[in-house]
Design a protein with these regions (language model features):
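Short beta-strand-to-loop acidic/aromatic patch adjacent to the donor-nucleotide binding site
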Residues: 75-85
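Conserved donor-nucleotide/metal-binding helix-loop-beta segment in metal-dependent transferases, i.e.
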Residues: 88-118
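Catalytic core and acceptor-binding pocket of nucleotide-sugar-dependent glycosyltransferases
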Residues: 140-169
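A structural signal for short, well-ordered beta-strand segments and their strand-loop junctions
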Residues: 36-38, 77-79, 108-113, 147
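Short catalytic/ligand-binding loop motif for oxyanion handling, primarily in non-cytosolic enzymes
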Residues: 15-18, 43-47, 86-89, 94, ...
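N-terminal anchoring/stem segment of glycosyltransferases
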Residues: 1-76
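Short, flexible, basic/aromatic active-site loop/helix in glycosyltransferases
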Residues: 123-138, 152
Length: 169
């Protein structure tokens, strides 16, 4: 999975779930080559397999994201949160299919979980459906496991300019 980084948004107050979350990533996604943790302060319970990028809680949510993304060199990011716990092995061929789709399309992202808010009328590839966000652009970003083109993620964050995490829920 060349050029893909796992990016976990979290907070040190959720450290009770870290052993399960990060342990399951290492167990069920061993081929993952790069993992970043966007967190408010260094947490010793997170292994060195995951590079911790510290964000300042005193600035806006968008600024925290953009500041951390400056340190991520990969072109694609897999957005996660600490409560998106893996419970089985990652089907890497499907992740690779999603990456190939993103590389060859103008789509910004591929959500890895279906939302009940969108119909599945526009199938563009096996198990990939195009969703229009024109009805409600605030749904361009959702807190779901999603593979993003990093540059598109940055544009969405700049457009939405959320001041807090609640502004994009």
């Amino acid at each position: 999975m060349e050029n893909l980084a796992l990016v976990t948004w979290t907070h040190d107050s959720y450290d009770d779930i870290f052993p399960v979350y990060f342990g399951n990533i290492e167990k069920f996604f061993p081929s993952l080559s790069k993992s970043y943790v966007l967190i408010n302060e260094i947490n010793d319970s997170i292994s060195d397999n995951h590079l911790q990028l510290i964000n300042d809680e005193n600035v806006s949510y968008v600024s925290r994201w953009l500041g951390c993304l400056d340190h991520i060199e990969e072109e694609y990011i897999l957005y996660m949160q600490e409560d998106f716990v893996l419970y089985d092995h990652v089907e890497e061929d499907k992740i690779n299919n999603c990456l190939e789709f993103l590389k060859s399309s103008d789509c910004s992202c591929v959500r890895l979980i279906r939302s009940g808010l969108n119909s599945l009328d526009d199938k563009v590839e096996s198990n990939i459906y195009k969703i229009s966000h024109f009805k409600d652009p605030n749904l361009s970003f959702t807190h779901q496991p999603t593979i993003w083109k990093k540059d598109h993620f940055i544009k969405i964050m700049e457009i939405l300019s959320p001041q807090s995490i609640r502004d994009v829920e």
